[in-house]
Amino acid sequence: MENVTATYDANELAWVTPILTLRRDIFLRITLREKGKVVIRQSDDKGNFPRVPIRRHKDTQSFEFRISVIPDIVQIQIFTSTEPKEIKYAYI
């Protein structure tokens, strides 16, 4: 699994990862130091990054996602409300 680092962004008031470019499906695991929220934004064909709907994205310390890449390339960015302990992903 590959590690992803997040830095605090005062404008977003959140911990933010760099934009990840994905070429195929991944398994994503996010573990927070304290309970918090997660938001994932995914690129669209216009260069915008709208939110990806997530059912249970609040008041949890550990999140696991399977992200399917339908077009050739997808870019995502991850935002967390509390400091992440680890963010990892693996191609599947």
State each model region's role.
Residues 9, 44, 57, 80:
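Acidic surface patches and DE-rich sequence motifs
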Residues 1-9:
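Short carbohydrate-recognition loop motifs
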Residues 8-21, 60-63:
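Short beta-strands within extracellular/lumenal beta-sheet-rich domains
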Residues 40, 82-92:
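Exposed low-complexity, polar/acidic, P/S/T/G-rich flexible segments that act as propeptides
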Residues 24-28, 67-82:
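Noncatalytic modules at the cell exterior or secretory-pathway interfaces
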Residues 35-48:
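Short, surface-exposed beta-strand/strand-loop-strand elements in extracellular ectodomains
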Residues 48-70:
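Extracellular carbohydrate recognition and processing domains
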Residues 18-34:
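Extra-cytoplasmic beta-strand recognition segments
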